[in-house]
Amino acid sequence: MISLSARLKVNLESLNGVETVGNFARHRTAPIIVHDKQNSFQVRYVPVVSGESIAHGYQTLLVDICKQMGLPIGVYSSRYEFIKFSEDNYLSDEGISPPRDYDDMQRFEVDVLTNDVVADVGGFLYTGRNSVKRTSRIHVGYMIPALKDTDAAALEAQFHVRYLQSKPQKGAGQQATDTQQPKLAQSIFNVEVASAIYTLNANLDVDEIAVPSIKFGKPAEESKLSKLENQKVSRKKAAILALGQLFSSMKSGAKLSRFLPNSELLSIVVTETSFPFSVSPGNGKDYISATIQRVEKASEMHQKAGIS
């Protein structure tokens, strides 16, 4: 199990919008619980970036890495469309037959895994007659302002204008007809941007990559299971590399072409354990030392129980 948490200083980002009201594009916000100066709890609404958005960015990086490493990628995943074998119409495009019954579910899962590393690492849900689910091996949460630094988080709408000089707006000395709509010389729009000290957590269950999760029914073909086993090391490397690129490139989110954030990785903590463990979130500057203390205690607990 690989677990990590990071603190990032991000200025002027519009990575995750939720809706457009007229000419106003809103940033995603969510409620969090913080301590106030009187040491009591209160609710604050703050800018956030959803885990869905971050996971999409991770899987996009995973696709690119798998292509470079010669690992299999499905038809839709190769287009960065992560619908992941969810319906029969998509299965036919991927060349995979749906599960006939419960005994056929392992065969179906293994067919999907051998066809697409993204479905292996990121999970999938087939919603046909005999539904099949594979839980994602990558777990990411919302990127939120650090709870001890929520005063360093703000939202503001930025005013923008697109101007069409070559075809000025009709109306000034020229009446528009019924068939000729007025041309707008100015197009006004507002985009809400955020700045904050963000924290982001992620876990990667490396040991379960390239391992079928369905343990019942008729076993899958031995040749396909052997193929997964032979690719296991490469698939793990690809998943870990994509996680590293996610934090090093910050290639995740919306409006990167005109609202590329001014971002800086302040600190990061990473653990690798043989047992389930999640690092302490980067809500305060002491999260690295807190993680070290916790992982030492967890290791001691497993050793006393005779678990390495």
Residue ranges and their predicted role:
Residues 45-59:
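Active/ligand-binding-proximal structured segments within catalytic/core domains
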